[in-house]
Design a protein with these regions (language model features):
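Catalytic histidine-centered segment of alpha/beta-hydrolase-like enzymes
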Residues: 199, 220-231
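Short beta-strand immediately N-terminal to the catalytic nucleophile in serine-hydrolase-like folds
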Residues: 39-41, 66, 192
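Short glycine-enriched nucleophile-adjacent loop
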Residues: 46-57, 63
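A catalytic-pocket lid/entrance helix-loop region that shapes and gates access to the active site
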Residues: 58-110
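Short beta-strand/loop motif that positions the catalytic acidic residue
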Residues: 184-185, 191-193
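Conserved alpha/beta-hydrolase "acid-adjacent" motif
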Residues: 172, 198-204
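Conserved acidic catalytic loop of the alpha/beta-hydrolase fold
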Residues: 19-38
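Glycine-rich "HGGG/HGxG" loop immediately N-terminal to the catalytic nucleophile
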Residues: 1-16, 74
Length: 231
């Protein structure tokens, strides 16, 4: 993905949105010389994979997805405003209280503002709070890192997420995937989703599966978001 991991330039947000990403996928397919491929993806990867399939359905043989994330307005509000706050109240309080009270009605906007502040100390502290809140709520076994310095993976996680979510995924439709599911309804799709996934809600997987003709939805009891959970 552009701007993170081993991609260069690191943290580059110019020409960095989901539509550039699906074109990058298509370039890879053409470069390798694959006619039709299987898309295997989870979490935001499912968002990207589904968006790719909507644009290039004839190039997708089948899909194996985990942790469906539709990236709609409800998904973002659930995580960063009200929803998960009722399950992780102490962790959310740290996340919320970093922002002044007069800005707490829109925490995404408030954090986005700080991530792109010229005040590097403020920016890094905001990034640390955001990324560690997210990692802590992803799996209950996660422990808060002891490092005082913000890590590169935390910077890219926070800035790129906020860039996408603040700009509503660069879509012109909050329900971009569901409203275009007709295009991919006959592609063989298998979905595994943890019943207690608090990051990507099981309702999203269910709603998507209801719009598909050739979908197998497997709800895995007793697990959350991570595909590496031992059960």
């Amino acid at each position: 993905q552009r701007g993170c991991g081993r991609s260069t330039p690191f943290l580059e947000l110019k020409e960095n949105n989901i539509f550039y990403s699906i074109e990058d996928m298509e370039k890879i397919r053409l470069h390798i010389g694959i006619d039709k491929w299987t898309i295997f993806a989870g979490s935001y990867g499912s968002t990207l994979g589904l968006t790719y399939a909507i644009h290039y359905p004839e190039k997708v043989k089948r899909m194996v997805l985990q942790g469906i994330f539709l990236a709609n307005e409800d998904d973002v509000k659930w995580y960063f405003q009200k929803g998960i706050s009722e399950i992780y109240p102490a962790e959310f309080k740290i996340f919320k209280d970093f922002i002044p009270k007069d800005e707490q009605d829109n925490l995404l906007e408030a954090y986005h503002k700080r991530f792109f502040s010229n005040d590097i100390k403020l920016r890094n502290e905001a990034i640390k709070i955001w990324s560690r809140f997210e990692l802590r709520t992803m799996e209950s076994e996660y422990t808060w890192p002891s490092e005082e310095e913000v890590q590169d993976y935390e910077i890219s996680l926070a800035l790129i997420e906020a860039h996408y979510f603040y700009n509503k995924m660069f879509w012109n439709d909050s329900e971009y995937i569901l409203n275009r599911a007709e295009i991919i309804k006959d592609i063989p799709i298998q979905i595994a989703h943890g019943r207690f996934d608090l990051n990507t809600r099981v309702i999203s997987a269910y709603k998507l599966s209801e719009k598909l003709n050739n979908c197998e939805l497997i709800i895995v009891e007793g697990v959350g978001h991570s595909p590496f959970t031992k059960k």
